A protein has these predicted regions:
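Alpha-helix boundary/capping motif
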Residues: 450-451, 455-457, 463, 470-471, ...
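Charged catalytic and DNA/RNA-contacting regions of genome-maintenance
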Residues: 1-337, 342, 349-362, 366-452
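Glycine-centered signal
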Residues: 263, 434-437, 455, 467, ...
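Intrinsically disordered, low-complexity regulatory regions of eukaryotic regulatory proteins
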Residues: 4, 390, 425, 454, ...
Length: 492
């Protein structure tokens, strides 16, 4: 491949960005298409069964290209992620009309199998977890390696659920079968010590530094000390947590504002099941074929995807604590005795996936229709909360407290959003009339509803925006449409 300096300006920009993400496919926005280039194009063409073409030449060679329309990008992303690929999404962030050279572009996020948050890319009834594995000490002989401490941290980015556990090398396969991560991060120097079915990403060994991990964890949780979380003095756990958080933050190009706590799991909390036992019990995966019966399919009558995912988690984590199991039984008994189960189930059927919407809000990637779904769900949640308040069980009371929401949240969303907003601001209107006077004026201008007084006001506004007194902005209404004319001020 020619060196970047020999390429056209657009391809120089592409190669600079690609050099920052050498190990993932680069989805490069060009107008109404996302394009792959060079080796990425050849690989994507095979994986997606799309046409491999060439677009002109750069650096003295033809440029291999393969692209998909922006409107169908989600379905192609889903296929790539299902195949274990990671994709960097490079968007146009500059204005093409104002750009003298290539339009400014930036990678806004990296989509990987373990960091999915888009509803269209996620299974409704299963979580996608990202795990990081830290080995305490260098590789030695196999007998000693089996007794070494291994730290595992995992994060479900679509809900903000961060957990960690400490095990030994010989117990690692059983723990991975329990956690079932969609992607694993491991140090480059430890890659040969890990045999896993999930896609594995390697990072430099220093990403697994325990002191760095402690600092990243304190910053993420907003605390001065980690004493309350039970990780101090456990270097393998701290190393795994630090590498996990660093990788997740890098993929999102955003703070993980919804990740606010850490739960440490102990092998003594649950009934121990090795990988073979889990498979033979057919808890969630059938022995023969993808469509075979499983215990999960038999039991799953949940009204929401959130409930189905919780049930799946419980099946893989059978409790040893009789008190915790009894608390669940008490709530179920109270629901049945009060005859509330059908009413609550019906109410839940109209509740969207709040876990995933909340995560996307925190990551600043929520779509308008998701916010509208949240707005419409809030009154239903309050009705469910009142129904649960009638149940006299400790676990039910804790649920009632957890469901308390800010009083003005629904009013704010109702006042801000249209009843049926567009899928995205590019597709149409999102904000309700009356929320922002300036936006209302611009909509009136777009619709051609502007008169002489409005034209004068628009002229003054535009002069302030331009910041020059030698520019004249004039508005004229012609055939129901408004035209803005910009020209030099004449000397008086």
């Amino acid at each position: 491949m020619p060196t970047p300096v020999e390429h056209t300006p657009v391809m120089q920009q592409y190669l600079r960005i690609k050099a920052q993400y050498p190990n993932v496919l680069l989805f490069y926005r060009m107008g109404d298409f996302f394009e792959f280039g060079y080796e990425d194009a050849e690989k994507a063409a095979k994986l997606l069964n799309i046409t491999l073409t060439s677009r002109g030449s750069s650096g003295g060679a033809r440029v291999a290209m393969a692209g998909v329309p922006v409107v169908s990008v989600d379905q192609h992303l889903a296929r790539l992620v299902k195949l274990g690929e990671s994709v960097a999404i490079c968007e146009q962030i500059g204005d093409p009309a104002a750009s003298k050279g290539p339009v400014e572009r930036k990678v806004v996020r990296v989509v990987t199998p373990g960091t999915l948050t888009d509803t269209g890319l996620l299974a409704d009834k299963a979580d996608a977890a990202l795990a990081a594995i830290a080995f305490d000490g260098p590789a030695r002989d196999a007998r000693r390696d089996r007794r070494d401490a291994v730290g595992i941290a995992w994060l479900v980015l679509a809900s903000g659920d961060l957990r960690a556990t400490e095990t030994t090398a010989d117990r690692l396969p059983s723990e991975l079968a329990r956690i079932a991560p969609s992607e694993i991060v491991v140090a480059e120097g430890a890659r040969e010590r890990l045999a896993a079915a999930a896609p594995v990403q390697t990072v430099p060994d220093w990403h697994f530094d325990a002191q760095r991990g402690a600092q990243l964890l304190r910053e993420q949780l907003g605390v001065a000390t980690l004493q309350a979380f039970g990780v101090e003095g456990r270097p393998a756990l701290l190393a795994a947590c630090g590498a996990l958080l660093a990788y997740a933050q890098q993929t999102q190009s955003e703070r993980l504002a919804h990740v606010t706590t850490l739960r440490i799991e102990s092998e003594s909390d649950f009934v121990a099941l090795d990988a073979v036992t889990r498979r033979n019990l057919e808890l969630t995966e059938p022995l023969r074929g993808d469509d075979g019966p499983t215990l999960f399919k038999v039991l799953d009558r949940c009204a929401t995807g959130m409930g189905s995912r919780r049930l799946r988690h419980w099946l893989h984590h059978p409790l040893r604590d009789a008190g915790a199991a009894s608390a669940r039984h008490a709530v179920i008994e109270s629901l049945l005795d009060a005859g509330l189960a059908p009413r609550i189930a019906e109410g839940l059927r109209h509740v969207p996936d709040l876990d995933r919407i909340a995560a996307r809000v925190a990551l600043k990637s929520a779509r308008p229709r998701e916010l509208a779904a949240l707005r419409d769900a809030l009154p239903r949640l309050e009705a469910l909360r009142r129904a649960l308040a009638a149940i006299d069980a400790p676990l039910a009371r804790s649920l009632v407290d957890a469901m308390a929401l800010p009083a003005d949240l629904h009013e704010t969303l109702a006042r801000t959003l249209l009843a049926e907003p567009a899928h995205s601001p590019r597709d149409g209107d999102v904000i309700a009339a009356g929320f922002d006077p300036e936006l209302d004026e611009l909509r009136a201008l777009r619709a051609g509803h502007v008169g002489g007084g409005d034209a004068d006001r628009l002229q003054r506004v535009d002069l302030r925006r331009v910041g020059r007194d030698d520019v004249a902005v004039r508005a004229a209404v012609e055939h129901g449409r408004t035209a803005l004319r910009v020209g030099q001020q004449r000397e008086q």
